């Protein structure tokens, strides 16, 4: 399978910082992988941070919340996020994600 990764390990010491990601507030810390078809990211949005609103023009996105709370605005509708939540943004739709809690 060459360079294709099958397992991603979360290591908070091995994350890159992306300031104002997609036009969002503060920054996110993340590790990203893209194979030309699928994009995978594992990371952290700090309290008061966000991922700016964007459209998924060529792919879909699934967000699984490991810890903390926040919300997404998906096609204009607010959806609350908490530990264990899964948010899906299909191709052609837009969303933003915000951490408005202390964690």
Residue spans of the language-model regions?
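Glycine- and acidic-residue-biased ligand/ion/polar-headgroup-sensing regions
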Residues: 58-70, 75
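Short strand-connecting beta-turns/loops that link adjacent beta-strands
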Residues: 36, 58, 102-103
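Conserved short histidine dyad/triad with adjacent acidic residue
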Residues: 41-56
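Ligand-binding loop in jelly-roll beta-barrel domains
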Residues: 91-103
């Amino acid at each position: 399978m060459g360079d294709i990764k099958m397992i991603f390990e979360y290591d908070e010491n091995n994350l890159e910082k992306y300031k104002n990601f997609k036009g969002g507030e503060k920054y996110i810390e993340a590790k990203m992988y893209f194979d030309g078809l699928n994009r995978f990211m594992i990371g952290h949005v700090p309290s008061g941070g966000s991922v700016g609103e964007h459209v998924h023009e060529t792919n879909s996105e699934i967000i699984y919340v490991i810890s903390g709370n926040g919300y997404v605005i998906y096609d204009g509708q607010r959806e609350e996020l908490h530990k264990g939540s899964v948010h899906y943004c299909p191709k052609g739709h837009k969303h933003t994600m915000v951490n408005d809690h202390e964690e």
